Amino acid sequence: ALDHFYEDGKTFEEVYDHIVSYVLDQCRSQDVVYVVPGSPVVAENTVTMLVERGQAAGVAVTVLPGMSFLEVLYTRLHLDPVNGVLILDSSDVASLPVDTTVPVVITQVYDKRVASDVKLSLMDLYGDEYEALLVHHISLPDEIVRPVKLYELDRIDTIDHLTSLVLPEP
């Protein structure tokens, strides 16, 4: 497990850089299997970085498919992405346009500071009382899917890196 990189890193960029460097270093002396939860191409920056830096270093990287949390979320909430769903990382909510005419999934609402930033950006578009869905640990035994008003978002104690917010279609 590479959890210690997350505990020691100051930013996600730093954490990802250290993980990729470590994995590529291990590849010099042995075959390595690097496994991520869910799909390796959904919200997994380290995989993209491994492919790019692996190619540059002459290391063969094979990426195999896996099911992401999004497939579970679509099923639980009866969302058909073919009809339109906007998926944003929490760090992009303030800087990217949000289409309020389709359901919006905001991933990686990983702490109260991020939740507060997301809340403030969304309240400008939807209003304080808008009811979103908090999706926490989906498909795990302690899964929570519950309504939450936007103004309450940063008051929730169960927020971590496996927390998302869904803004249903208006």
Q: What kind of region is each of these model predictions?
A:
Residues 15-22, 79-94, 150-162:
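A polyampholytic, Gly/Pro-enriched intrinsically disordered region
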Residues 34-107:
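Class I SAM-dependent methyltransferase SAM-binding "motif I" and its flanking Rossmann-like core
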Residues 22-25, 49, 72, 76, ...:
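Alpha-helical scaffold segments in soluble metabolic enzymes
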Residues 2-10, 69, 93-94, 113, ...:
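A short acidic, often aromatic-flanked loop/helix-cap motif at beta-alpha or helix-coil junctions
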Residues 1-60, 163-164:
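Class I S-adenosyl-L-methionine
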Residues 28-32, 98-170:
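A contiguous loop/helix-start segment that scaffolds small-molecule binding in enzyme catalytic cores
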